[in-house]
A protein has these predicted regions:
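NAD(P)H-binding glycine-rich loop region in Rossmannoid oxidoreductase-like domains
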Residues: 9-49, 75
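Conserved Rossmann-fold NAD(P)-dependent oxidoreductase catalytic core, especially the SDR/UDP-sugar
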Residues: 52-95
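Active-site Tyr-X1-5-Lys
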Residues: 78, 91-115
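C-terminal amphipathic/interface module of NAD(P)-dependent oxidoreductases
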Residues: 194-235
């Protein structure tokens, strides 16, 4: 733990455990989420109900706190005609993005001072996300040439720090680095290359996000591309 920090254990599913973590705080950063499971009910309980519990506790015990919530770029519809912008249509059907979108709506409808960061594919520091790509691509039919917006862990922190400054108050903001990357490239970087394909892409803009608003608000990635991360040894 950093010097001066105090750890308080809580459970988003148990509202009674939340007040001790919130009393007197000036800011709340909500990064908790559940998605690596086939239990859709558990996803909804964690992401929708858990967020609502945290919002209610914040309204009661830290109503003046700045509330920064991590969401996902997966909320956008797949059939975009360009990289997704914050005002674009969002009608997700899968449990994870749908539950995150409802959580966003709950926060936006609260009386709190909020900001929402829609994150792309996040990787870095050996978190295992890149290593999953060679296995997940065939399972989910990901085209090797499909490109995704990405961001390193460091730049999630960069975005959170900017949000905590107040620059993103009352906004939903896409976060992404400077260069989208293909599934093929991610598998190569993971050390387990995929077969290529000349089949046409469907929904080629799915997974791509436009970070222009973030740039206007002061965000610049400290890890500009996934290849910079590879050179630094921080994949």
């Amino acid at each position: 733990m950093p010097a001066g920090a105090t750890s308080v254990r809580g459970d988003l599913a148990d509202p009674d455990t939340l007040p001790p973590a919130l009393e007197g705080v000036e800011a709340i950063v909500h990064l908790a989420a559940l998605f690596r499971t086939e239990d859709e009910d558990a996803i909804w309980r964690a992401n929708r109900d858990g967020t609502r519990n945290l919002i209610a506790a914040a309204e009661a015990h830290a109503p003046a706190a700045r509330f920064v919530m991590a969401s996902t770029g997966n909320v956008y519809d797949d059939d975009q005609v360009r990289p997704s912008r914050e005002g674009d249509r969002c009608t997700p059907t899968a449990a994870y993005p749908a539950s995150k979108l409802v959580a966003e709506e709950s926060l936006r409808g609260s009386g709190l001072n909020w900001s929402i960061l829609r994150l792309p594919f996040v990787y870095g520091d050996g978190d295992g996300h890149l290593a999953m790509i060679p296995r997940m691509a065939p399972r989910f039919g990901l085209h090797p040439a499909h490109t995704y917006s990405v961001a390193h862990h460091r730049d999630v922190m960069t975005a959170v720090e900017i949000a905590l400054s107040g620059a993103m108050d009352g906004r939903i903001v896409n976060i992404a680095d400077d260069r989208p990357v293909t599934v093929y490239e991610m598998a190569e970087l993971a050390g387990d290359p995929l077969e290529g394909s000349a089949e046409p892409l469907t929904d080629p803009w799915s997974g791509r996000m436009d970070p222009s608003l973030a740039h206007q608000l002061g965000f610049r990635p400290t890890v500009p591309t996934i290849y910079d991360a590879a050179r630094e040894g921080i994949l």
